[in-house]
């Protein structure tokens, strides 16, 4: 463990471009098992995984192979999608006490509460994808290389840091 590294956290909010600069899940984030991908008030997807960070990365890579609807949405809306927000949460948060911190039940609770556009399972009334976004079925207009998008995200992060 790195000296001075913080302990586990229950919630992290990061832009997709920032997440794409992290090759490995930071140790304090490893217990975060739920994730939300959104653009402001538009919630695209809610999911779960024993390591949510890794699952978001899987969606990103699988979008290039059309194996992930969320990943495809990211690719089809690049470069705007690099500014979307990724929320990583722990099912151990107090807000999930009513469902006894059960991971499946916590995910279902978030889906019912947020009605994400892309979740079809467990979602009685998914929000329609606003017309401002290209659907995941659209042909991508960005480079078909994940590494190129990761580099573009890195440039955007550096430009943002210079402005502040």
What is each stretch, according to the model?
Residues 1-32, 38-44, 48-164:
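Boundary/linker segments flanking structured domains
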């Amino acid at each position: 463990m790195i000296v001075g590294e913080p302990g586990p956290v229950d919630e992290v909010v990061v832009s997709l471009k920032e997440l794409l600069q992290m090759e490995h899940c930071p140790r304090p984030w490893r217990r975060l098992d739920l994730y939300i991908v959104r653009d402001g008030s538009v919630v695209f997807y809610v999911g779960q995984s024993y390591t949510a960070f890794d699952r978001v990365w899987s969606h990103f890579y699988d979008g290039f192979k059309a194996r992930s609807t969320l990943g495809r949405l990211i690719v089809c809306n690049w470069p705007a999608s690099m500014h979307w927000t990724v929320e990583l949460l722990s099912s151990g948060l107090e807000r999930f006490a009513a469902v006894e911190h059960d991971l499946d039940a916590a995910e279902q609770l978030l889906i019912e509460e947020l009605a994400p556009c892309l979740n079809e399972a467990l979602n009685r009334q998914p929000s329609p994808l606003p017309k401002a976004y290209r659907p995941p079925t659209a042909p991508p207009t960005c480079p078909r290389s994940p590494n190129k998008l990761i580099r573009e995200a890195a440039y955007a992060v550096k430009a943002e840091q210079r402005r502040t």
